[in-house]
Amino acid sequence: MSVDPSTLSLGGLVTELAERGECRHDPDLHMGPDAFEDEPLAERLARQDVAREVCEDCPVWALCLDYALRIRPAFGVWAGHLPRELAALQREARTLAAAALEEVA
């Protein structure tokens, strides 16, 4: 079932992700250890690589990306992206939107 992310509230997106996201099987893979547990760099990078692979086949990838772009997470892997990558996608989208508006004007 394909759902248009723009038609869902944040709550609706959370529900879809919780019910259908591949990350629901192992949330720690995508979020990492809790704030009180240290994670060595090599382990974090390896975990993030595996999380990205899981995201590749996720049936709600587009919903996850939409959700992540809305909430701007500070940590974790969302739709195969780290927070800094999501921020770069947002900047690029704003730049493209501004350029498109200039062309119309």
Regions found by a protein language model. Name each.
Residues 10-27, 31-33, 39-59, 70:
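Immediate flanking context of iron-sulfur cluster ligation sites
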Residues 1-13:
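Polybasic, low-complexity association/targeting segments
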Residues 38, 45, 79, 91-93:
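Surface-exposed beta-strand edges and their flanking turn/coil or helix-capping segments
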Residues 17-18, 23-24, 81-105:
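Short Fe-S-cluster ligation motifs
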Residues 34, 68, 90:
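Short, flexible helix/strand-to-coil boundary loops that buttress conserved ligand/catalytic motifs
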